[in-house]
Amino acid sequence: MLLPSLICMLALSIEDIRSRRIPRLWVFSGAMVQLIVFVCWSLINADGRRLALCLVLALLSAAIQFLMAVIRPGMLGFGDVTCTAATGLAVGWLGLLPVLMWWCFMGILGLTAIGVAVLRMRHNTPGTTRQTQIPFAPVIASAAVLSCVIDAMSLLAV
């Protein structure tokens, strides 16, 4: 059900690590394919509430990420905001609790990535400068996968 988002997140993460950019066309394409899957499921099951919830949670997540990017320019780019919107669509499909877990994991993994970057700069690792950017798409994707796996495990435990 979430395979389009997983494939898109993997591709975006690799591209972000490789080039420090997130192609918006990839984000849009992945989000549209995932949305088509959700719309089909909603039509087959005659249930639009879940679709509405995931759309609201995705937009809210993107809005929060956008505010963070505006408040602290240079830390997050617009690609990270769009990646959050697309990923939020998938995580939002699972409900509010997985979205909250996702945000917690993004915070933990994001701070870990910053800590690793600072340590690399302190030890003068070749290729690091004061301007070294941290690819955030892998953080967004990893946090999403973690929250989805934990959500799936909690469903199996019931």
Regions found by a protein language model. Name each.
Residues 1-158:
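A membrane-topology feature that recognizes alpha-helical transmembrane segments
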